């Protein structure tokens, strides 16, 4: 199979060495997608994003997390540099942890329309408590909807210890 043609890459405006600008304001329009060349098979794409930061909506104090994003693409995949810049745009965004992971998932569903997606935020403890919100979604009316229900019900049967953060 040949590599990607220039025509396939024309809509990826953020990739490459072109003087990247970082947005400190939440901006879902930063997300870019490209065609999935393997739509005939199910496979997972997983992103581990250990440098996520956002602000507490009440105190303005910074919150830090590793965000895990896993999805089964359909026709589109998210481009990783655009995802990095998008996640960086949460830097001055004030929202609760639970809101952040749901916003991330909703924005990715909107641009990619995946078969299945899950987002798990593992936030560093503040005030002696860590918050690890998990959300997922499977395309309604398909096996992925059932998969989402199963994974939600079984996602944290063996919780990790927090001493690894």
UniProtKB/Swiss-Prot annotation:
pH and activity: Optimum pH is 7.5.
Signal peptide: none
Thermal dependence of activity, per record: Enzymatic activity increases 12-fold in response to a change in temperature from 25 to 65 degrees Celsius. Displays a half life of 43 hours at 55 degrees Celsius.
Superkingdom, natural source: Bacteria
UniProt note on regulation of activity: Is totally inhibited by 4-aminobenzylcyanide in vitro.
EC top class named in words: oxidoreductase
Catalytic activity annotation: 7-aminomethyl-7-carbaguanine + 2 NADP(+) = 7-cyano-7-deazaguanine + 2 NADPH + 3 H(+)
Cellular component, GO annotation: cytoplasm
EC number: 1.7.1.13
One record GO biological process: tRNA modification
Active-site residues per Swiss-Prot or TrEMBL entry: 56 (thioimide intermediate), 63 (proton donor)
Keywords carried by this UniProt record: Cytoplasm, NADP, Oxidoreductase, Queuosine biosynthesis
Keyword NADP appears in the UniProt entry: yes
Positions that bind substrate: 78-80, 97-98
Protein location: Cytoplasm
Protein purpose: Catalyzes the NADPH-dependent reduction of 7-cyano-7-deazaguanine (preQ0) to 7-aminomethyl-7-deazaguanine (preQ1), a late step in the queuosine pathway. Is highly specific for its natural substrate preQ0, since it cannot use various aliphatic, aromatic and heterocyclic nitriles, although it can reduce the substrate analog 5-cyanopyrrolo[2,3-d]pyrimidin-4-one with lesser efficiency.
NCBIfam families for this protein: QueF-II (TIGR03139)
Family: Belongs to the GTP cyclohydrolase I family. QueF type 1 subfamily.
Protein name according to UniProt: NADPH-dependent 7-cyano-7-deazaguanine reductase
């Amino acid at each position: 199979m040949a590599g990607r043609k220039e025509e396939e890459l024309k809509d990826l405006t953020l990739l490459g060495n072109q003087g990247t600008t970082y947005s400190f304001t939440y901006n879902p329009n930063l997300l870019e997608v490209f065609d999935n060349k393997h739509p005939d098979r199910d496979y997972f794409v997983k992103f581990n994003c250990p440098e996520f930061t956002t602000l507490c909506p009440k105190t303005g104090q910074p919150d830090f997390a590793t965000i895990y994003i896993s999805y089964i693409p359909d026709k589109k995949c998210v481009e990783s540099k655009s995802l990095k810049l998008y996640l960086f745009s949460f830097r001055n965004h004030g929202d609760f942890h639970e809101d952040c992971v749901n916003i991330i998932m909703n924005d990715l569903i909107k641009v990619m329309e995946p078969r299945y997606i899950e987002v798990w935020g593992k936030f560093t403890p503040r005030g002696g408590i860590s918050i690890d919100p998990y959300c997922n979604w499977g395309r309604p009316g398909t096996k992925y909807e059932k998969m989402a229900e199963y994974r939600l019900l079984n996602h944290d049967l063996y919780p990790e210890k927090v001493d690894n953060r």
